Amino acid sequence: MSAVTQHHADELARGADELGVALDADKQRQLLAYLALLIKWNKAYNLTAVRDPDEMVSRHLLDSLSIVPYAEAGDNWLDVGSGGGMPGVPLAILFPEKRLTLLDSNGKKTRFLTQVKLELKLANLEVVHSRVEAFRPESPFDGIVSRAFSSLEDFANWTRHLGGQETRWLAMKGVHPNEELAALPEDFRVEAEHALAVPGCQGQRHLLILRCTA
C-alpha cells in the first residue's frame, strides 16, 4: 500500500486553501510525489526527524507553502542548507518559471534532491553539493531562503557573498528570534517580519525578511 493516501491529498489541499495558495491538480500531484520520495528515502538517508506522513504534510509541505506569498518576486532563488528539500522543492513546484538552486554540504541529501529533480522532472531546479562558504555562483540571487539552517548572524555572514543590494534574505524561524536579531550584522536590516499560521502545526512560526545595506 502506498505511504501517501487520499487522506494526505485532502490534508494538503485543505491546508493550501487555508494558506491562500492555489494548487492545481498537477502541482498537487507533484507535491504528493515528493512526499512519497521523502518517506521512502528517509528510512535509509535520515533526511528528517519527522517520520509520520501526516506530520510531514503539515510540518514540511504546508510549512514550505506558507512562505509562497513572500517568494513571488525574483526569478533566481537559493535554498541554503536545503536538507530534504524544504522549502526549495515545493517552491520549485509552485513556481515553474523560477530557477531554484538547492545547496547542501551533505552528499546523501544532495543525492536525494537530485533524484527528486529527475523523478519529478523539475527542469527549473539545480542541486549543488557544496559548503555555502565555497559556493561561487555566476551572479547574485534574487532571493536566499533558509529553514532551520543556522542563526540569523551566521545566515547573513555565510551567504552575504551570494546576494546583492536587491536580494532579499528569507529566514524561516519557529519562535521569534529576539536574541538572534540583536546579533544581526550591522550591514543587514530587517525589512519585514511575519507571524505564520501553518495548518496542522503547533507552536510559533515566523518569517523574517532581511536586506543587506552594504
Swiss-Prot record:
Enzyme class: transferase
Domain of life of the native organism: Bacteria
EC number: 2.1.1.170
Gene Ontology cellular component annotations, sorted alphabetically: cytosol
Subcellular location per the Swiss-Prot or TrEMBL entry: Cytoplasm
Main location: cytoplasm
Catalytic activity entry: guanosine(527) in 16S rRNA + S-adenosyl-L-methionine = N(7)-methylguanosine(527) in 16S rRNA + S-adenosyl-L-homocysteine
Keywords: Cytoplasm, Methyltransferase, rRNA processing, S-adenosyl-L-methionine, Transferase
Keyword Methyltransferase among record annotations: yes
Gene Ontology molecular function terms on file: rRNA (guanine-N7-)-methyltransferase activity
Family statement: Belongs to the methyltransferase superfamily. RNA methyltransferase RsmG family.
Record function comment: Specifically methylates the N7 position of guanine in position 527 of 16S rRNA.
Record's protein name: Ribosomal RNA small subunit methyltransferase G
Lineage of origin: Bacteria, Pseudomonadati, Pseudomonadota, Gammaproteobacteria, Pseudomonadales
Gene: rsmG
